[in-house]
Design a protein with these regions (language model features):
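Short beta-strand/loop segment at the start of cytosolic alpha/beta domains
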Residues: 1-15
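Short hydrophobic/aromatic patches at helix-to-coil boundaries
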Residues: 2-4, 97-101
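Conserved catalytic submotifs in the C-terminal HATPase_c
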Residues: 8-9, 49, 101
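Amphipathic alpha-helical interaction surfaces in cytosolic regulatory modules
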Residues: 19-98
Length: 101
């Protein structure tokens, strides 16, 4: 899992590339929390356009990010979600809790 971060006007964007599975989830959570704690954004955008596969570990990542952003009074948006991860989010109900673009 490759992760790149950019921040602009209290919006943090994390661009994800590769497989979001149990191998990459821990590193992604650590990086996301580090970036959130550094930039203190009001919005976190997870750009998933580069995600080629996602299992239930991706749900844990999104929920952890959502929890941290709620502590800061902010929100999470999932952007450019490919078909396979979207099916996982829809089946889990995450799509009802987190905005998807």
């Amino acid at each position: 899992m490759e992760i790149s971060a950019s921040s602009r006007e209290r919006c943090l964007t994390l661009r994800l590339k590769g497989e979001l599975d149990h191998h990459g989830a821990r590193g992604l959570i650590q990086r996301a929390e580090q970036e959130i704690d550094t930039t203190l954004p009001l919005q976190l955008a997870l750009d998933m356009s580069g995600v080629t596969f996602m299992d239930s570990s991706g749900i844990a990542v999104v929920m952890r990010c959502r929890q941290r952003m709620r502590e800061l009074g902010g929100t999470v948006t999932l952007c450019h979600v490919p078909t396979q991860p979207r099916k996982v989010f829809d089946a889990s109900g995450i799509s009802k809790l987190v905005a998807m673009e």
